[in-house]
Protein backbone atom coordinates (compact mmCIF):
# COMPACT_ATOMS: atom_id res chain seq x y z
CA UNK A 1 0.00 0.00 0.00
CA UNK A 2 1.25 3.48 -0.83
CA UNK A 3 1.55 6.22 1.78
CA UNK A 4 -1.53 8.06 0.54
CA UNK A 5 -3.54 4.81 0.68
CA UNK A 6 -2.47 4.31 4.29
CA UNK A 7 -3.56 7.85 5.09
CA UNK A 8 -6.96 7.31 3.43
CA UNK A 9 -7.38 4.15 5.51
CA UNK A 10 -6.46 6.10 8.64
CA UNK A 11 -9.17 8.66 7.88
CA UNK A 12 -11.66 5.80 7.46
CA UNK A 13 -10.63 4.41 10.86
CA UNK A 14 -11.19 7.83 12.45
CA UNK A 15 -14.67 7.97 10.89
CA UNK A 16 -15.37 4.49 12.27
CA UNK A 17 -14.18 5.67 15.68
CA UNK A 18 -16.61 8.61 15.57
CA UNK A 19 -19.50 6.22 14.97
CA UNK A 20 -18.39 3.67 17.57
CA UNK A 21 -17.84 6.41 20.17
CA UNK A 22 -21.53 7.33 20.06
CA UNK A 23 -22.33 4.13 21.97
CA UNK A 24 -19.10 3.01 23.62
CA UNK A 25 -16.79 4.79 26.04
CA UNK A 26 -13.20 5.37 24.95
CA UNK A 27 -10.37 4.48 27.33
CA UNK A 28 -7.37 6.84 27.04
CA UNK A 29 -4.32 7.56 29.17
CA UNK A 30 -4.59 11.32 29.62
CA UNK A 31 -6.46 14.53 28.89
CA UNK A 32 -4.22 15.41 25.93
CA UNK A 33 -5.42 12.22 24.26
CA UNK A 34 -9.00 13.43 24.72
CA UNK A 35 -8.12 16.86 23.28
CA UNK A 36 -6.50 15.29 20.20
CA UNK A 37 -9.51 13.05 19.57
CA UNK A 38 -11.97 15.90 20.06
CA UNK A 39 -10.04 18.03 17.54
CA UNK A 40 -10.54 15.17 15.09
CA UNK A 41 -14.29 15.35 15.71
CA UNK A 42 -14.60 12.34 18.00
CA UNK A 43 -17.34 12.91 20.56
CA UNK A 44 -18.40 10.59 23.31
CA UNK A 45 -17.57 9.43 26.78
CA UNK A 46 -13.86 9.44 27.51
CA UNK A 47 -12.41 7.56 30.47
CA UNK A 48 -8.96 8.79 31.49
CA UNK A 49 -7.01 6.08 33.26
CA UNK A 50 -3.87 8.05 34.14
CA UNK A 51 -4.21 8.02 37.91
CA UNK A 52 -7.06 5.60 38.59
CA UNK A 53 -6.49 1.91 39.29
CA UNK A 54 -7.85 -0.26 36.50
CA UNK A 55 -9.97 -2.36 38.85
CA UNK A 56 -11.83 0.78 40.04
CA UNK A 57 -12.61 1.76 36.46
CA UNK A 58 -13.82 -1.80 35.80
CA UNK A 59 -16.00 -1.64 38.94
CA UNK A 60 -17.62 1.57 37.71
CA UNK A 61 -18.23 0.19 34.21
CA UNK A 62 -19.81 -2.96 35.62
CA UNK A 63 -22.00 -0.82 37.88
CA UNK A 64 -23.12 1.21 34.84
CA UNK A 65 -23.69 -2.02 32.87
CA UNK A 66 -21.24 -1.06 30.13
CA UNK A 67 -20.77 -4.05 27.82
CA UNK A 68 -17.97 -2.78 25.55
CA UNK A 69 -15.24 -0.12 25.51
CA UNK A 70 -12.84 1.19 22.88
CA UNK A 71 -9.22 0.96 24.02
CA UNK A 72 -6.88 3.73 22.83
CA UNK A 73 -3.77 3.55 24.98
CA UNK A 74 -0.46 4.79 23.60
CA UNK A 75 1.89 2.68 21.49
CA UNK A 76 4.91 2.89 23.78
CA UNK A 77 5.92 0.22 26.29
CA UNK A 78 3.78 1.70 29.07
CA UNK A 79 0.75 1.92 26.76
CA UNK A 80 1.16 -1.70 25.69
CA UNK A 81 1.44 -2.84 29.31
CA UNK A 82 -1.64 -0.81 30.27
CA UNK A 83 -3.56 -2.27 27.33
CA UNK A 84 -2.69 -5.80 28.39
CA UNK A 85 -3.75 -5.15 32.00
CA UNK A 86 -7.01 -3.47 30.93
CA UNK A 87 -7.91 -6.27 28.53
CA UNK A 88 -7.28 -8.88 31.20
CA UNK A 89 -9.24 -7.07 33.95
CA UNK A 90 -12.16 -6.00 31.78
CA UNK A 91 -12.64 -9.35 30.06
CA UNK A 92 -12.56 -11.03 33.46
CA UNK A 93 -15.49 -8.73 34.36
CA UNK A 94 -17.40 -9.46 31.15
CA UNK A 95 -16.58 -6.15 29.43
CA UNK A 96 -15.59 -6.51 25.77
CA UNK A 97 -12.49 -4.51 24.84
CA UNK A 98 -12.32 -3.22 21.26
CA UNK A 99 -8.63 -3.08 20.32
CA UNK A 100 -9.23 -3.08 16.55
CA UNK A 101 -9.25 0.71 16.17
CA UNK A 102 -6.08 1.12 18.25
CA UNK A 103 -4.36 -1.53 16.14
CA UNK A 104 -5.46 0.07 12.87
CA UNK A 105 -4.31 3.54 13.97
CA UNK A 106 -0.88 2.06 14.66
CA UNK A 107 -0.76 0.33 11.27
CA UNK A 108 -2.08 3.20 9.16
CA UNK A 109 0.16 5.81 10.75
CA UNK A 110 2.99 3.51 9.67
CA UNK A 111 4.14 3.48 13.30
CA UNK A 112 4.64 7.23 12.85
CA UNK A 113 3.16 8.16 16.21
CA UNK A 114 3.88 6.88 19.69
CA UNK A 115 0.81 8.23 21.42
CA UNK A 116 -2.83 9.13 20.84
CA UNK A 117 -2.22 12.80 21.64
CA UNK A 118 -0.08 13.02 18.46
CA UNK A 119 -2.86 11.73 16.21
CA UNK A 120 -4.42 15.14 15.49
CA UNK A 121 -1.12 16.74 14.48
CA UNK A 122 -0.23 13.67 12.38
CA UNK A 123 -3.51 13.97 10.45
CA UNK A 124 -3.41 17.77 10.29
CA UNK A 125 0.11 17.84 8.77
CA UNK A 126 -0.98 15.51 5.99
CA UNK A 127 -4.21 17.33 5.20
CA UNK A 128 -2.75 20.83 4.86
UniProtKB/Swiss-Prot annotation:
Binding sites annotated in the UniProt record for Mg(2+) 1: 29, 74
Keywords tagged on the record: Magnesium, Metal-binding
Toprim domain: residues covered: 23-105
GO molecular function: metal ion binding
Superkingdom as given in the UniProt entry: Archaea
Cofactor: Mg(2+)
Glycosyltransferase in keyword set: no
Cofactor note: Binds two Mg(2+) per subunit.
Positions with a binding annotation for Mg(2+) 2: 74, 76
PROSITE patterns attached to this UniProt entry: TOPRIM
InterPro entries on file: TOPRIM_dom, TOPRIM_RNase_M5-like, UPF0292
First and last residue of the signal peptide: none
Keyword Magnesium attached: yes
Family stated for the protein in its record: Belongs to the UPF0292 family.
Xref: NCBIfam families: PRK04017.1-5 (NF003094)
Protein name: UPF0292 protein MJ1624
Organism: Methanocaldococcus jannaschii (strain ATCC 43067 / DSM 2661 / JAL-1 / JCM 10045 / NBRC 100440)
